[in-house]
Design a protein with these regions (language model features):
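The alpha/beta-hydrolase serine catalytic core
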Residues: 101-204
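Short, non-ligating residues that shape and space the ligands of small metal-coordination modules
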Residues: 237-241, 263-264
């Protein structure tokens, strides 16, 4: 290999890594009362996360609700978080973290009611009245969540939650119009519930990717490489000859199989065989 070819190979490798990580998605896990960012629940998400997802566990100051919410917001902005998952008390905090896709599992919907019931456990003290007051002071915000933001929330409730039961499922439906799903789980999130969330995340990503396959003329022409998730070939944009007129623009047809399943790399998506085959399985 010549020196020039060697340098080119190195540059392409670096660009490939940049391309890969640009397509990464990040999930932030917010634990419950006296939980841990390295606990079993977070480890389950790391075990079952979809491809190209990174799971980040964070700790927060649980003694002060307002400070905890600020710490979560700072983490979202610093890490570029795409999805937040919160369980129990972390579910309450996650509900109030607006502007991002989020899942809540067995959320402690009313901390002012549930926290006083907790007793000292394994060296951890019971919640103090001062701590409880900081959460009670934020509960009014639940009913003030904007309608558009509520659509970003998916709630799941364990069918065997020994602490909260199912009462907050009905309350959230009445207050927020969010009817939570029922999953096989006790209060601590089960592996089945984690698997369900990860499957939903994978499916949502594929739906997002699918949007790049129609009315995509501008994006295709800005790309260097295109891929088709029907025949799973990759090719240059100038090979595309046929377009379909859609309502808001033109849609590219694959030059090999003539299917409207073409995505350009200007989308930021990884057009490797793994991705194209995964899309093929989802949509064909």
């Amino acid at each position: 290999m010549t020196e020039v070819a060697g340098k080119m190979a190195f540059v392409l490798e670096i660009l490939g890594e940049i391309y890969y990580f640009r397509s990464m998605k990040k999930l932030l896990y917010v634990h419950g009362y006296n939980g841990s960012p390295d606990g079993g629940s977070c480890r389950l998400f790391k075990k079952h996360k979809p491809e190209n997802w990174e799971v980040i566990g964070m700790d927060y100051c649980q003694d002060d609700c307002e400070l905890a919410l600020r710490q979560i917001r700072e983490t979202i902005e610093r890490e570029g978080i795409d999805v937040v998952v919160g369980c129990s008390l972390g579910g309450f905090l996650t509900l109030l973290t607006t502007g991002v896709r989020r899942f809540v599992v067995n959320p402690c919907y009313l901390p002012s009611v549930e926290l006083p019931k907790l007793k000292p456990f394994e060296g951890f003290p019971a919640p103090s009245p001062e701590l409880i007051a900081t959460y009670a002071a934020q509960e009014w915000r639940l009913k003030q969540l904007p309608e558009v933001d509520r659509k970003n929330i998916t709630a799941l409730f364990g069918d065997s939650d020994e602490l909260l039961g199912m009462k907050y499922r009905d309350m959230m439906a009445d207050d927020l119009g969010i009817l939570g799903g029922i999953v096989p789980s006790q209060h601590h999130i089960s592996e089945e519930a984690v698997l369900l969330i990860c499957q939903m995340l994978s499916d949502e990503r594929m739906k997002d990717a699918h949007r790049h396959s129609f009315e995509n003329e501008e994006e295709i022409k800005a790309s260097e490489t295109c891929g088709c998730f029907s025949c799973c070939r990759t090719f240059a944009p100038n090979e595309i000859e046929d377009w379909v007129d859609d309502a808001d623009g033109k849609t590219a047809l694959c030059p090999y199989c003539h299917t409207d399943a073409v995505i350009g790399d200007a989308s930021g998506l990884p057009l490797d065989k793994t991705f194209l085959h995964a899309m093929n399985l989802r949509w064909f």
